[in-house]
């Protein structure tokens, strides 16, 4: 019997109404245990209400963003001028790093967390859109500061930061032992999920996370994201009986960030 715990987190909750419904479906009928919501989305409050009514057991964290397409910050433009283009929208992910001021990033991300809590719910954890805190050590520092301020777990940033001592940066911040990002785009398949489950069983550590992007498709998503059709396939796989049985056969316990020890 395995003692492994697995968080399966769906990113982008509240991105569009169809994304929200796809994530709820993957939770209610499938293996998704957790999600992270976008307070900068115009559909955020609608998504939180949908979760309250239709998926009360779904853990929800904050998906901090600096790069959400066609979205604007929570704070007024004059307070975060380095984060936005001339029209007041977030920079594209390909160029934002050279533009942003870290103090403004801290203030905006802090405002996003506060906006989430104004929905009447405390976040389960925090992570970031496009995993920006896992690609830039300075942005990781901002995310860690906010995790400490609010005493929230933070997604493991080990994938992209090329340093052996990155975990030392976390110190008293709770994080899964390992983050598994491989279930994405062309690698979306039942075989990929089964391989990741085997990695969980064979790896050191107790708590693991697989991130995913299940969704239904609407015209809003098609107009805003280049990653659309694979999301439907994710819903199909994450609600499949084969995946449910594979998790049970390996003795893996589905969990959320509350499973991380204080």
From Swiss-Prot:
Mg(2+) binds at residue 129. Probably catalyzes the deacetylation of acetylated carbohydrates an important step in the degradation of oligosaccharides. The keyword DNA-binding does not apply. PANTHER family: CARBOHYDRATE DEACETYLASE, YDJC DEACETYLASE FAMILY MEMBER. One of its GO terms (biological process) is polysaccharide catabolic process. This is Carbohydrate deacetylase. Its EC number is 3.5.1.-. Belongs to the YdjC deacetylase family. The keyword Transmembrane does not apply.
């Amino acid at each position: 019997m395995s003692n492994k715990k697995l968080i399966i987190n769906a990113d982008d909750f509240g991105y569009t109404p169809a994304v929200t419904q796809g994530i709820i479906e993957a939770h209610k009928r499938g293996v998704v245990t957790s999600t992270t919501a976008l307070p900068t989305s115009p559909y955020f409050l609608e998504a939180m209400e949908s979760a309250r009514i239709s998926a009360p057991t779904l853990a929800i964290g904050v998906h901090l963003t600096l790069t959400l397409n066609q979205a604007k910050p929570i704070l007024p433009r004059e307070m975060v001028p380095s984060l936005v283009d001339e029209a007041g929208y977030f920079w594209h992910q390909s160029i934002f790093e050279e533009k942003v001021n870290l103090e403004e990033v801290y203030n905006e991300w802090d405002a996003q967390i506060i906006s989430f809590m104004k929905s009447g719910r405390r976040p389960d954890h925090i992570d970031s859109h496009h995993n920006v805190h896992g690609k830039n050590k300075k942005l990781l520092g901002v995310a860690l500061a906010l995790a400490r301020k609010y005493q929230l777990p933070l997604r493991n940033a080990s994938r992209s930061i090329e340093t052996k001592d990155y975990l030392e940066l976390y110190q008293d911040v709770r994080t899964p032992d390992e983050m598994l990002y491989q279930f994405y785009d062309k690698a979306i398949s039942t075989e990929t999920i089964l391989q990741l489950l085997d990695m969980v069983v064979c790896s050191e550590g107790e708590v693991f996370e697989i991130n995913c992007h299940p969704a239904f498709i609407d015209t809003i998503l098609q107009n805003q994201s280049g990653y659309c059709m694979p999301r439907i396939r994710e819903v199909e796989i994450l609600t499949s009986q084969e995946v449910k049985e594979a998790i049970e056969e390996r003795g893996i316990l589905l969990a959320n960030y509350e499973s991380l020890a204080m």
